[in-house]
From Swiss-Prot:
Gene: mcfU
Stated family: Belongs to the mitochondrial carrier (TC 2.A.29) family.
Chain positions of Solcar repeats: 56-148, 188-280, 298-388
Function description: Mitochondrial solute carriers shuttle metabolites, nucleotides, and cofactors through the mitochondrial inner membrane.
An MF annotation (GO) of this entry: iron ion transmembrane transporter activity
UniProt keyword Transport, yes or no: yes
UniProt keyword terms in alphabetical order: Membrane, Mitochondrion, Mitochondrion inner membrane, Repeat, Transmembrane, Transmembrane helix, Transport
Topology, Mitochondrial intermembrane side: 1-57, 146-186, 272-303, 382-390
Annotated source species: Dictyostelium discoideum
PROSITE patterns assigned to the protein according to its UniProt record, in alphabetical order: SOLCAR
Transmembrane annotation, as ranges: 58-78, 125-145, 187-207, 251-271, 304-324, 371-381
Protein name, entry field: Mitochondrial substrate carrier family protein U
Length: 390
């Protein structure tokens, strides 16, 4: 009897255990179903807000591009003001007083002492109104070019791998043998964003000119007090109205082609240097990996280095046209008899004659101090914001 009771109790325990296991399994299944439903709802929510993943990416690049530029401009704009003043003060050789600033440090001290620290942000509003949307569009085009270029194997080798010489040789052999690399859909895909970037940059340079003219005149007019340049605390809007009143609406777009001469090569050098540096660093940090090992990703420091190099190369190679641009767009602050520049060639000859070739690099150190960390910070912030959103 005792054995029978024991058997019954054992059976009951087994049944209870089985029931508990079944209940646990049911609970797990219910949890899995709930998780799946939540995932489906989340996907539906994302799809309702972003119907197309590519549109979502474009929005991310727009936000990251404008956000990175906002961070960079807040930190670095004072250096842009100092750079503009140093470049402009060469015009005093046509006035009645000598150069006011002896260098970067002296310019900072003099400006803050005589006008206050906020004067370093004079012209910031017209600058921001342009650079935020322009930066957003530039980064969207840049991402499109990179993604489309990576679809083409040979283009990828030439642009993104360190073994680019071999790819160039192969491409040349294809052409010599009667083949055409342009038939690749990847290369056609690359041409479109490059074309879009070019058109966007041309349009942007023209539209940027009024903001640049107002910004630079505000930057220089506050401190250069002599019989030619009067001190003013006018707003950006009032400065624009004054230009229109004096020179008409075309005064805001004067020498817009000079902006184009600077911006197009700068953009090409800027983004290509950044991408080359990033991919070269990827090659360096992953060259010791064995087959099957996960590739290491670039850190914020790597992005900072790449961005800084891009800014350094772009700035150094385009500084002569930047000096000419500043002089052309600010000389209207002087009386008509003191305006000796009629265009790029005229400005180039005048600067060489009176200041030598060194005059074409005026403000380079300040511009490098401004652009190099600005570019590094901008790309670093861009990659970080993009990582957060994607």
């Amino acid at each position: 009897m005792n054995q029978k009771k024991q058997i019954k109790s054992d059976n009951l325990q087994q049944q209870q255990q089985q029931q508990q296991q079944q209940q646990q399994q049911q609970q797990q299944q219910q949890q899995q179903q709930q998780q799946q439903q939540q995932q489906k709802q989340h996907i539906k929510y994302l799809n309702s807000n972003f119907k197309d993943v590519e549109k979502n990416k474009i929005l991310v690049h727009l936000i990251a591009g404008s956000g990175s530029k906002l961070v960079e401009s807040l930190v670095m704009f004072p250096l842009d003001t100092i750079k503009t003043r140093l470049q402009f003060q060469g015009d005093f050789s046509r006035g009645s007083i000598k150069n006011r600033y002896s260098g970067i440090v002296n310019a900072f001290k003099t400006t803050i002492r005589s006008e206050g620290i906020l004067s370093l942000y004079r012209g910031y509003i017209p600058h921001t109104l342009y650079v935020l949307p322009a930066s957003a569009i530039s980064f969207v085009c840049y991402e499109a070019i990179v993604q489309e270029a990576k679809k083409s194997k040979k283009f990828k080798n030439m642009m993104f791998d360190t073994s680019g010489i071999k790819a160039v040789k192969e491409t040349g052999e294809d052409l010599r043998n009667g083949g055409s690399t342009s038939t690749s859909s990847g290369r056609f895909g690359v041409l479109l964003p490059i074309f879009v970037m070019t058109i966007a940059r041309i349009t942007g340079s023209v539209l940027r000119t009024p903001f640049d003219v107002v910004k630079m005149r505000q930057q220089v007019s506050g401190s250069l007090v002599n019989e030619h340049v009067k001190k003013t605390n006018s707003t950006a809007f009032n400065s624009a109205l004054k230009i229109i009143k004096t020179d008409g609406i075309i005064g805001l777009f004067k020498y817009s082609y000079v902006s184009l001469l600077r911006d197009l090569p700068f953009t090409a050098i800027y983004f290509s240097t950044y991408e080359f540096s990033r991919n070269y660093q990827k090659h360096l940090i992953n060259r010791g990996l064995k087959s099957g090992e996960k590739k290491k990703k670039l850190s914020s420091i790597n992005n900072l280095i790449s961005g800084s190099l891009a800014g350094a190369f772009g700035t150094t190679l385009t500084i002569p046209i930047d000096v000419i641009k500043t002089n052309l767009q600010t000389q209207d602050l002087l009386p008509k008899e003191k305006r000796v520049f009629n265009g790029v060639i005229s400005a180039f000859k005048y600067i060489i004659k009176n200041e030598g070739f060194k005059g074409l690099t005026k403000g380079l150190s300040t511009r490098l101090i401004h652009i190099v960390p600005s570019a590094g910070l901008s790309f670093c912030a861009y990659e970080y914001i993009k990582k957060l959103l994607l």
